């Protein structure tokens, strides 16, 4: 299965009538493996900030999580495993696998829990596969 198929079929899938507004799978170095057409262009320093927070949990909290220049307030995640952010009625979930970052961006009517489930389920699967 191609990385694009993982994004299209497993991240941008419908859940309880809703779906993510954007999603991507990127390497730890910031290289884009696959993304939805709506995913924002990430800046290198944004990926560096995300990776730093996985290595030193809490480092993004004071400044916020930035994706494509959009700032998300960091909310409780799982230190070293999942970073969650909120912006108005929407937000983001970032799950770190062995080789990649899975990023899901959502907006109402999708809920934070639905976004977490979609992103983390695929992330857990990739971890089980050694990816």
From Swiss-Prot:
Keywords annotated in UniProt: Actin-binding, Allergen, Cytoplasm, Cytoskeleton
Coiled coil regions, renumbered to chain: none
Major location category of this protein: cytoplasm
Taxonomy, superkingdom: Eukaryota
GO cellular component terms listed in the entry, alphabetical order: cell cortex; cytoskeleton
Task of the protein: Binds to actin and affects the structure of the cytoskeleton. At high concentrations, profilin prevents the polymerization of actin, whereas it enhances it at low concentrations. By binding to PIP2, it inhibits the formation of IP3 and DG.
UniProt family annotation: Belongs to the profilin family.
Subunit annotation: Occurs in many kinds of cells as a complex with monomeric actin in a 1:1 ratio.
Name by which UniProt lists this protein: Profilin-2
Lineage, broadest ranks: Eukaryota, Viridiplantae, Streptophyta, Embryophyta, Tracheophyta
């Amino acid at each position: 299965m191609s990385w694009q198929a993982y994004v299209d079929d497993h991240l941008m899938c419908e859940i309880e009538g809703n779906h993510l507004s954007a999603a991507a799978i990127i390497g730890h170095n910031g290289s884009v493996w696959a993304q939805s057409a709506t995913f924002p262009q990430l800046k290198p320093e944004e990926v560096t900030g995300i990776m730093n927070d996985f290595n030193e949990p809490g480092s993004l909290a004071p400044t916020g999580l930035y994706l494509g220049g959009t700032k998300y307030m960091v909310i409780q995640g799982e230190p070293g495993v999942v970073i969650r952010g909120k912006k108005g009625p929407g937000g983001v979930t970032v799950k770190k696998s062995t080789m990649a970052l899975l990023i899901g961006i959502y907006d109402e009517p999708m809920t934070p829990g639905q976004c977490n489930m979609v992103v983390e389920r695929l992330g857990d699967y990739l971890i089980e596969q050694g990816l």
